[in-house]
């Protein structure tokens, strides 16, 4: 049988299979033969006349019909692409021999367009007449806005289907978070008997986004073991969603309004226009899949961020093989990321060079990147030659993918935009300066007056306030605990570490020049209960954290109680052989409740940052070591505004926001021990371990044993503290595992 005959037979079989696919789809339970636009119109008409069962019937059918049509498009395009791929011998690249033989060139074109026609025939037979599956742009927008659920929640409520009403209302509100009426409806539903928390379901939730957000939440709660399966599931669902999104891009050409009246193009220009539009749509899937209705902007670098979360989560559970695989995969997208290279080097050292070298990046990520870069090359080429705009949704695209002429044009446009922005910015700064000069003095007085509440306990003294520390919402106090208490808590840390503190005595991947031991309040109490550490030391640890919480709450004159967000007693020890020419820090400058971008002078308050943290404190247990000073900076992470030297019984407290970037200098000799505490004003984010610790303390001790010393009616600490013998440069510092 000739090659052409075999191709024709394959095409006929594919078209027949496509027709069978449509018949099979129409016989499925979810298929509704009526068009979604007609069903939606019937539903709105039923709503107008108060026919609530009619609203439910038609709106539910409209949603099912639209979902079935979407599924049919996906199946047809996937099936036809699989059954009728481009012919293996169809070389689409330049062939010098074709220019010498016009007949061969014509045959080449015919083979190409023959493949196109056969694919089109397959799709036509599978999808059916175009009129059967086209929705108007306006109606598609209504479905995307989740409007059917707005009608459904009222109708369900009217016919006493409360569980469905709650789910429909919640689904609509997730897509329309500014809709005040629906917010009021949801508040009302929450007060009704019989309504459960599980009823508030998003019926349109995207599986990949649901798993990602759940995984990130568990990651932020420092539960890496539980976060990993959700982040891995998010990746699997992402690639499925990406293929579906891309398949749906292969629709009719969008003429953009009435442009079709003036559209005039030859064969190849028309093909180019349509294909580039399809490629643009496919690249835009990056943005679509990274978007969530509750966010103003999509997640930045959404796919690579999965591997970033996973590499550190796997490290935290001791799985270096997977940590290396995810780190290498992340580096496919950002090959110059210094921190990731440091992490990879650390993981490699822990696993072994030979075994680590055999681990490759994930294959599906490599394929994704290769395909995406090829598409970008075509899109940038079309932008450069035909002027068809393309906005790259990714920040990881290598510069060499963009044509040089286009690079120069974009550079010129950026420089112009920057110049205009700077001129506007300078003008705004002048105006702001005039306003600030008038308000700054009164604001400073207000802040200082607000701070300076009682220190509650005898022996505690104010060492530095916000004014001395050159900032706001900052304080350093001494005498919080005694020398004996410091030594006992230090012994507790080292004893708990030998009993298993969850870190296995290893160094952090970010600070390979130090090792650390740590123990939480709950862990210490459990070890005390088991007799592995002195129970009274664990009780002291619990009491001291409560003492610091009360003092911070009082000093900053907070109207709302502080709740523990996380508590950690940790010791960091310098590794002697690793200190030569050391330039790193125990922890670089950061902000406790947002992601600091020092270059842009901004801090993004979103996960994985602990956005719910409001105040932070660190209580030092010793000062007999070198380095390890705590320091505050400006948002640029370079300009140091104050520095604090640790010593026994000294506490540093501050608000956790952008006003207080801070870091920790390297510990170059000895061991630095401290209790790190984070607090929240939101009881919903109260530390679960603390609640368990409270219950365990009640079980193990009598009320008299856990009562703190009587709070003293001391005067407010409003004035500037008396300067001590130390200068600002002699005072204290910290790390993510601390502050």
Swiss-Prot record:
> Composition bias, kind Basic and acidic residues: at what positions?
728-739
Q: Which reaction does it catalyse?
A: L-prolyl-[collagen] + 2-oxoglutarate + O2 = trans-3-hydroxy-L-prolyl-[collagen] + succinate + CO2
Q: Which residues form the active site?
A: 672
Q: Which SUPFAM superfamilies match?
A: TPR-like
GO cellular component term, pick one: basement membrane
Question: By its UniProt entry, which InterPro entries does this protein fall under?
Answer: Leprecan_dom, Oxoglu/Fe-dep_dioxygenase_dom, P3H, Pro_4_hyd_alph, Pro_4_hyd_alph_FE2OG_OXY, TPR-like_helical_dom_sf
Annotated GO biological process: bone development; collagen fibril organization; collagen metabolic process; negative regulation of cell growth; negative regulation of post-translational protein modification; protein folding; protein stabilization; regulation of ossification
**Residue ranges that the Swiss-Prot or TrEMBL entry lists as coiled coil:** 404-442
Q: Where does Fe cation bind?
A: 590, 592, 662
* EC nos: 1.14.11.7
- The answer to whether UniProt assigns keyword Repeat to this entry is yes
Q: How is it modified after translation?
A: O-glycosylated; chondroitin sulfate.
Glycosylation positions? 319, 470, 543
Which cofactors, if any, are listed as required? Answer: Fe cation; L-ascorbate
* The Fe2OG dioxygenase domain, residue ranges: 567-681
The record describes the protein's role as: Basement membrane-associated chondroitin sulfate proteoglycan (CSPG). Has prolyl 3-hydroxylase activity catalyzing the post-translational formation of 3-hydroxyproline in -Xaa-Pro-Gly- sequences in collagens, especially types IV and V. May be involved in the secretory pathway of cells. Has growth suppressive activity in fibroblasts.
Query: Which protein family is named in the record?
Result: Belongs to the leprecan family.
Q: What is the name listed in the Swiss-Prot or TrEMBL entry for this protein?
A: Prolyl 3-hydroxylase 1
Per the UniProt entry, what species is this protein from, by scientific name?
Mus musculus
Q: What's the encoding gene here?
A: P3h1
